[in-house]
């Protein structure tokens, strides 16, 4: 026996089949958000259909950067510098390491699934400002109501059952990270829990029926 297995990926076509062969969860780790990620995710669901496998949304996980504040304006004031730091500084990887020979198959290259790190990704983000990051879906940010609405849209658009929200971004300090996490947990997450509730989720970890916890040590 083992806990459910979740496999991270960035668009390799072979990973889709490897995951489906083993009935694991495929987790697309997207730094550029749900609008750009839709093409890869749709490719995954197309492959699921081609293989005659059920399209339970919980087969898919998706990483989305999220910033929550009291209002849309305060979200920009609090998070903009840290988001810019992330995209302009933290995706810097020497090109030969980001796209080394043999790292991706010819099949994946032909499908034009581009890497999210390295020189190309860095250049693409250099000129973007807060409004661009929001409008292009790189981040979902704003008041709790704004974030709830956009995450609901993203979950349904992608048909994703395991929405993984990245709440510490770039140079974000501890106090702001805690605020982001608390606002998300209290004012956003409860509204998202029933999305896809009509589907069973066998890939979510379950507690052992006959567990015998060890006593807490001194």
Predicted regions, residues:
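An alpha-helical appendage that flanks or caps ligand/catalytic pockets
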Residues: 35-160, 193-218
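Short, proline-enriched alpha-helix->beta-strand connector loops that line the catalytic pocket
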Residues: 1-4, 134-135
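Alpha-helix-loop-beta-strand connector modules within alpha/beta enzyme cores
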Residues: 182-196
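Short, contiguous acidic/charged loop-to-helix segments that flank catalytic cores in large enzymes
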Residues: 136-142, 171-175, 179
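A conserved active-site cap/scaffold subdomain adjacent to cofactor or substrate pockets
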Residues: 11-41, 45
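Hydrophobic faces of well-ordered beta-strands that scaffold small-molecule active sites
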Residues: 5-8, 24-29, 58-65, 163-165
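Conserved, mostly hydrophobic/aromatic
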Residues: 5, 19, 44, 75, ...
């Amino acid at each position: 026996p083992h806990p459910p297995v979740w496999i991270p990926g960035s668009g390799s076509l072979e990973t889709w089949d490897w995951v489906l062969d083993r009935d694991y969860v495929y987790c697309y780790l997207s730094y550029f958000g749900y609008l750009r990620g839709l093409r890869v995710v749709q490719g995954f669901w197309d492959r699921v259909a081609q293989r005659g496998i059920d399209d339970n949304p919980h087969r898919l996980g998706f990483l989305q950067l999220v910033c929550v504040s009291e209002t849309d304006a305060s979200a920009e004031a609090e998070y903009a510098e840290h988001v810019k730091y992330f995209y302009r500084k933290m995706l810097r990887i020497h090109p030969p390491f980001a796209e080394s020979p043999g790292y991706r198959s010819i099949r994946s290259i032909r499908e034009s699934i581009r890497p999210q790190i390295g020189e190309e990704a860095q250049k693409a983000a250099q000129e973007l400002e807060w409004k661009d990051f929001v409008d292009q879906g790189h981040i979902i940010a704003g008041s709790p109501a704004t974030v709830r609405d956009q995450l609901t849209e993203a979950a349904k658009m992608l048909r994703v059952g395991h929405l993984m929200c990245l709440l510490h971004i770039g140079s974000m300090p501890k106090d702001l990270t805690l605020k982001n996490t608390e606002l998300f947990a209290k004012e956003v997450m409860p509204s998202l829990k029933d999305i896809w509730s009509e589907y069973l989720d066998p890939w979510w970890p379950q507690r052992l029926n006959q567990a015998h916890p060890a006593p807490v040590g001194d």
